[in-house]
UniProtKB/Swiss-Prot annotation:
Keyword Disulfide bond: no
Gene for this chain: uppP
Annotated localization: Cell membrane
Broad class of where this protein is predominantly found: membrane
Enzyme class: hydrolase
A GO BP entry: peptidoglycan biosynthetic process
This protein's name: Undecaprenyl-diphosphatase
Organism, scientific name: Clavibacter michiganensis subsp. michiganensis (strain NCPPB 382)
EC code(s) of this entry: 3.6.1.27
Amino acid sequence: MSYLEAIILGLVQGLTEFLPISSSAHLRIAGLFMGGDPGATFTAITQLGTELAVVVFFRKRIGKVLSAWSRSLRGGMPKGDPDVRMGWLVIIGTIPIGIAGYLFQDTIRSTFRSLWIVAIVLIVFGILLGLADRYSRSDRLEKDMTYGHGVSIGIAQALALVPGVSRSGATTTAARAFGYSRPVAAEYSFLLAVPAVFGSGLYELVKSFDETGQAGAGQTAVATLIAFIVGLAVIAGLMRYISTRTFMPFVVYRVALGVVLLVLLGTGAIAA
């Protein structure tokens, strides 16, 4: 992988991580034009850049949650405090993806990366997002979120281990299905992703510095930095967008991309 290709993949990661269109699917597709799949390890490590963008953008909220949660363990904060509850909601919501990632890590690296699977789940989960966003109530706020909902949204996040599902798309779909407003759904989705993505990214980084697909350490670092810069801008833009608009443009894009992939695969224009 050249540095130019690393920059392009970093741009793709940064542009697509927070939109409900699946960054891993787009990295997989981009690999078609760059001589091969960049790999699950490369994807996991570059996601560290976009999750660092989440930490920077939500630094005040994350700081409050961490402070309140840690103080509650010592009896210094009531368990019903909103920030304490959010801390527990993030923890319990992270458990499903931790279990699934450990149990299915080999399948994630191989079978799940088939473009046939990517195309199908782009369409299916795009339709689910559209239905949840269109027909669900939108009046539930963060204070209404139950631990049961947190676990359910966490299970949705675990499904995003399959490229094409989209971490933000799956968690937002689940939250919208439970009736939470778009800003609440998006913020919880972002906060929920932090421990999961940092965990998987650091695990892959420590596990092997030479298992980053065709990318070397330098190229991976460049892609991660680009993903951070672009991702920070995308978060800000998305939070403004969803305050007044729906997810329907992303639904249309997902379905269209999935259909195009199926046609290209069916005609033999591209290989799975």
